[in-house]
């Protein structure tokens, strides 16, 4: 049992160690390949999962966006219906007022029928002509409003379609940006995987080179030992010439073994020389490959840095554009809300002011132009020639506001005329006040009236106007008589003198 244990503890030979080491290397390479396959499978599964999630998210975004667009369209249609209903009610009120005025005229004409038949018939003809004119005007106004509403509807429809197309393009751009980001991330992961693979390859080559150097050192050591043993053997044979005959058989046997070993050694030396040459060639090739790979790696890293810088710059620009777009959209929404509030306020004021409209304003809300059609055409052509195309388009877009500005200008003119009339009445009132004050001063007596010059005021048959002749001077010893005032109205004096 002890001999078997000693045999089990015998160390392995160099060839067995080399085979064991090669088996370990093969096992490690198989493990690395297996890990690489697992990593590739994991990345493929992750890629498929990301593509599936992106498709689901895109479908969700499209469905939510459709609901938002439907809500916006319904609100706009509700607003259009409200505006149309208000205009219809206003037209109906105008027609009701026209019918009331015509009924009133007809009743008056029937009352006067017994007195003047001819005048009645004449007035009936005038009323019919007036009615025809009014109906024509109403029809023209209705047609104009209908055309304006159709144009407004078409423009709103066009703007909505354009906005929808812009939003579709924006979503497509967002999708392309997401796809580009995904491609960039995939490319970065591929670069990282390639760099890791190159590092592992370089590491394996270095380990292989180190093992080859180690094996060469072992072979050289064995050769040196063999030479020493051979030298010792030759020395021993010289010292033991006496035992040559006895050991001749052993010598021949050993010589044959030595020759066999020498052949093996020669073969090993030849194989070592061949392996050294191959190692040198492979080392040179590996150095060149490593140099090329390092240069390619540097170029790839430089390009990667540039791409990362460009991506960060593009991301910053996109973020700035997004912030600017949100600010501008919020500002436009605020401005549109203010415009809508102003329009609602104007409509409310118009409804309030309709109570104070006269019959004439209800029948003919818009005054006709004093210009002839020819002059109107000349002015329109001249205005369009003066402005450029863009400004002309804007003016044509706001042409439907002419009736509004007509009523506005009419109100401003009436306001100015009322102010002018008020100033005239104030001036007349001041003049009347002055005349009344003078009249009251003439019929009343007070210290202020006595102190002022008044030709109508006479005391003791004398007025208080200054006399041309000088008054006699009084003596210093004389006493002034008490002042007595006899008041006589000027009208009484004039009646007696006449």
UniProtKB/Swiss-Prot annotation:
Component of the nexin-dynein regulatory complex (N-DRC), a key regulator of ciliary/flagellar motility which maintains the alignment and integrity of the distal axoneme and regulates microtubule sliding in motile axonemes. Plays a critical role in the assembly of N-DRC and also stabilizes the assembly of multiple inner dynein arms and radial spokes. Coassembles with DRC1 to form a central scaffold needed for assembly of the N-DRC and its attachment to the outer doublet microtubules. This is Dynein regulatory complex subunit 2. One of its GO terms (biological process) is axonemal dynein complex assembly. Component of the nexin-dynein regulatory complex (N-DRC). Interacts with DRC1. Pfam families: NYD-SP28 (PF14772). InterPro entries: DRC1/2_N (IPR039505), DRC1/DRC2 (IPR039750). Its main location: cytoplasm. Keywords: Cell projection, Cilium, Coiled coil, Cytoplasm, Cytoskeleton, Flagellum. Belongs to the DRC2 family. It is found in: Cytoplasm, Cytoskeleton, Flagellum basal body; Cell projection, Cilium, Flagellum; Cytoplasm, Cytoskeleton, Flagellum axoneme. GO terms for cellular component: axonemal dynein complex; axoneme; ciliary basal body; motile cilium. The gene is CCDC65. The keyword Kinase does not apply. Residues 98-160, 250-311, 417-441 form a coiled coil.
